[in-house]
Design a protein with these regions (language model features):
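Extended beta-strand/beta-hairpin segments
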Residues: 1-57, 68-149
């Protein structure tokens, strides 16, 4: 896996904190920083997600992918899946994630709660490299609801 991240500044001015990531699979992702009122030249313009937001989003994508795949392989009638991630970070540098809660909503027909619980556990214990890495610094908790469709 590879990725190239380039500083773009704000709208090409080279004065902000905008970045573009180009992935090895040919996709592009924009990132930006929060505005800094005390030093505007060092802040972003809030035009794109912050880098750590992309880490959190990537973790959500990784685990949701696993959960859907595991449920489908178990021949469950899964029709939708979303995960809402909330987090806390350390107050001092490096501001690593210290707590992450993942709340899954799985939509389908006749999906047993035990199957969803198992899929989430398998993702977090075996398959989702992102959540396994973040679990080294953060306490990760999960919850789920099943919506009958």
């Amino acid at each position: 896996m590879e990725c190239t991240v380039s500083w773009t500044g704000n709208a090409g001015t080279r004065s902000g904190m905008g970045f573009i990531a180009e992935t090895g699979s040919g996709h592009v992702l924009a990132m930006d920083g929060a505005p800094d009122a005390s030093r505007p030249e060092n802040g972003g313009q809030n035009l794109a997600p912050r880098p750590m937001e992309t880490v959190l989003a990537g973790t959500g994508g990784c685990t949701a992918y696993d959960v859907v795949l595991i449920l489908k392989r178990g021949r469950h009638d899964v029709r939708g899946c979303s995960v809402r991630l909330t987090s806390e970070r350390a107050d001092t540098d490096p501001k690593v994630f210290t707590r992450i809660h993942m709340q899954f909503t799985v939509t389908g027909r006749g999906i047993p709660p035990a199957a969803v619980e198992r899929a989430i556990a398998m993702s977090h214990e075996k398959y989702c490299s992102a959540s396994i890495m973040l679990g080294k610094t953060a306490q990760i908790t999960t919850g789920f609801e099943i919506v009958e469709a």
